[in-house]
From Swiss-Prot:
One MF annotation (Gene Ontology) recorded for this entry: rRNA (guanine-N7-)-methyltransferase activity
Family to which the UniProt record says this protein belongs: Belongs to the methyltransferase superfamily. RNA methyltransferase RsmG family.
Organism of derivation: Pseudomonas putida (strain W619)
Main localisation: cytoplasm
UniProt protein name: Ribosomal RNA small subunit methyltransferase G
Function: Specifically methylates the N7 position of guanine in position 527 of 16S rRNA.
Subcellular location per the Swiss-Prot or TrEMBL entry: Cytoplasm
NCBIfam families, per the entry: rsmG_gidB
């Protein structure tokens, strides 16, 4: 274990994952802690996250990401994390689902350099890192799932990623407060499939997940 990661961090991750109903293998637990160590190390120079205190990163980043894993459909094997930043939730998604192809996209070159380093050091062969504005990204095939965490408004999220999915794609938007005002401006060809209130161990404040579909 890296000297940047404490036994308390390891225990908090184990306990929090159990509370979320997420079963972590020893390898997944080790990789998540390895990711945490890289995040702590690189954040000092690269400003990857506004969370400066390493003791807050387990709950606010790792467990927050794990809180949506139960909504990742087992049959959807290609996922895009839009505006991934420091890699949430894309890196935990790639660690927990090695059989799925996960793409993390960000327009900030420093952040994609960090994500590339994470891919190399953690040997995440199922992870692809893309340095691009989302509007300019043109994948060969539509993604089965598109996810974002605090990326933008619901209107922008759906409009900017419309070309990256199709009517079979699920869009997952991770939010804090329920975005009722944003849903009013949702494009007419998108519909809310479900809304989930999430409880993240160690996190104060509201968390919500909205799952969207595009109409045929």
């Amino acid at each position: 274990m890296s000297s940047l990661v404490t036994p308390q961090h390891a225990e908090e991750l184990s306990t929090g994952a159990r509370q979320l109903g997420v079963e972590l293998s020893a390898e997944q637990h080790e990789r998540l802690l390895g990711y945490l160590a890289l995040l702590i190390k690189w954040n000092k120079a690269y400003n990857l996250t506004a969370v400066r205190d390493p003791d807050e990163m387990v709950s606010r980043h790792l467990l927050d990401s794990l809180s949506v894993m139960g909504f990742i459909h087992p049959d959807r094997d290609s996922w895009l994390d839009v505006g991934s930043g420091g890699g949430m939730p894309g890196i935990p998604l790639a660690i927990l689902h090695p059989q799925k192809r996960v793409t993390v996209l960000d327009a900030n070159g420093k952040k994609t350099r960090f994500l590339t380093q994470v891919k190399m050091e953690l040997k995440l062969d199922n992870l692809t890192v893309i340095h691009s504005r989302v509007e300019a990204f043109q994948p060969a095939q539509p993604f089965n799932g598109i996810i974002s965490r605090a990326f933008s408004s619901m209107e922008n999220f759906t409009n900017w990623t419309r070309h990256l999915g199709d009517t079979g794609t699920q869009w997952l938007a991770m939010k804090g407060l329920h975005p009722a005002d944003e849903l009013v401006a949702l494009p007419a060809d998108f519909t809310v499939e479900s809304e989930q209130a999430l409880t993240v161990p160690g996190c104060q404040g509201q968390r919500h997940l909205l799952i969207l579909r595009r109409k045929a």
